[in-house]
Amino acid sequence: NNIDYTYKGRNYIQMSTSDDPALSESDERAITVDVLLATSVENDAVINFELLDNADDILRLENGAVQIKAGEKTARFKVLSNRQSLLNNQRMITLKVKDYTDERMQPWNELKLTVRPNPTLPDLTEQQIEFVHGYMEKYRLNLNRFMGEVSCRVEVTFPADEVGVFSDTETRSFEGKSMITLSENATADRPILKMIDNPMGITSFLWEIYRKETVENEFWIFEGSKYVSMMEAIGYDMSKEVFSVVLDNLELLPDEGTFSFVGPTLNLWDEEIESLPFEYSFTAWERWKKMADEGGTILVQEGDNMVEASVSDLIEEGITLNPVCLVYSSIDEDNWENEPSDWIEPKGMFNEKTFSFQFPWDHVNSLGYTQIRVTYTLNE
């Protein structure tokens, strides 16, 4: 039997990362990229990678010429910030395969990486500085350790039915940093924090789910779709759009060593629910909303004809980029009732070394609760 059963098709090059695919320009952290081939190579091979939209060399590759030995099919390399502090606006940079030495190879995907300008911490007012001193005297609570750029570790567990839909794996864990300040709602008696950049370390995760709910949704991107008409009308360009998130009203309860952080917020249907009051902003949505506010119209396809439609009416119809699709149901009790339950009780705690949160979270096309657990290390 001399039949050769070895795979002779295209050897696809797949890239992935389990790290947070977003960096601040000042970050020392690297994004580790895993390379996986469909099948092992017969001879030693080299794959070269490159970064698009990387003017001024904002990012750099470490070992970007990846060598794969005969008989192997995996490799990894790193992407780092050059830490030049040049950016004024967020930038999306695309990592792609440049070339390769094995003619059977073919790129399977690209990776989108986000680089944010260095977050700046607003100066506290004199009154806020007094509050912080007061918390030390009143509660023996050094709030300075909770503020500034604070490092965290995040663990995300998806509902079982969402694996293959919203995520390739059931759990993910990654490192991040949040920029935290004293909330304008803090008082002399009530220490309240506000996360002004990368709240809970999950901005990239929220942006990924938002894209899957909207611009990457297969029901959006077909020929003649009103969604496509909307994106053309606003000049949608993913590499230039900015998606940002803020989280206010994280109140420390010093006597208990806990946080109160769940509060009323509005969902897609303008119903008040109990959840984390994330405040989302997205540049493409701002432009679409402005067109509606100014009474704008666009041409859309109805059957075989192009007709003029008011942007306000289209938004009413659900042709929208509003990030409120990331707000769905109350998390103070189990509204999904999946078997087994994927709900966890929302909790926030702090001690001398760390502060941590756990909470269930869902979005419009969820199939249950995603469980999010975040642990911050207090600044020294």
Give the role of each language-model region.
Residues 1-160, 379:
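Acidic/polar, low-complexity intrinsically disordered N-terminal segments immediately downstream
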Residues 122-380:
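Ser/Thr/Gly/Pro-rich, low-complexity flexible regions
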